[in-house]
Amino acid sequence: LYLDKIVQSHRDVASRDQRNLDDLVGQACALSSTRGFAEQLVQGSRENLCVIAEIKRKSPSKGVLHANLDAAHIASLYEQGGASCLSVLTDEHFFGGSVEDLQIARASTSLPVIRKDFTVSEFDVVDARLMGADCVLLIAAALSDDELSRFHDLAVHIDLEVLVETHDEHELERALNVGANIVGVNQRDLITFEVDHARAERMASLIPPTVVRVAESGVRNADDARRLRDAGYDAVLVGESIVTSSDPVAAVRDLKVA
């Protein structure tokens, strides 16, 4: 399975990490405050659907999306288009991302940034904060209840926001149980890669109004965006359709439906 293979490779790396976690947590706690990720989405969604614009060079399912992507340039185009936040892939092996991409993108805009990666250990959580991310991704399908809870609490402790990604009602329940205040609903089935718009629309109504609702994957155009906005989503996380666009500014702007 696609997700299992990626997660296992990340777990293998994490198991060999010899660093002292307490030292790293201390360093993270000493950093200056982050840019408010949830707050940006809460404010923006009062006016229109927010766009979390993703910097993604390639993916296992689609191959190369944007070979010689300039992270600083595309980040500033996303900001010009009205993106509320950035999402940056830092997985090198499967997605061609890097820590450097995240740092460059964040430095070239004023937007909050989520580290998009496969978080499988406490080290991954703390590393996200140390590299400059404002928010970290936790994928419910990849983690046990204990891990989800521990990683979420550690992130909160080091002033790092958390987006918990879910795929179905059971995972949504798990996300809410750990106190997630930003929940993503991934419309793409991780096994078949098919996009299920109906499930995302159905799940929106199950997310409490105090929680920021983000729809992920399979958002291709303004019609998709409008349907998700009508279903109750505050934001869409979009990568492929804007990173491959000849005009990323317009592509982002088009998704910001009122």
What is each residue range found by the language model?
Residues Y2-N68:
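An N-cap/entry alpha-helix motif that binds or orients negatively charged groups
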Residues L49-C50, I55, K62-L163, E169-R174, ...:
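N-terminal active-site wall of soluble small-molecule enzyme domains
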Residues F95, E165, V214, G218, ...:
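Active-site-adjacent beta-strand anchor residues
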Residues I182-V238:
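Catalytic-face loop-and-helix region of soluble metabolic enzyme cores
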Residues R202-L206, T244-A258:
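C-terminal helical cap(s) of enzyme catalytic domains, especially alpha/beta-barrels
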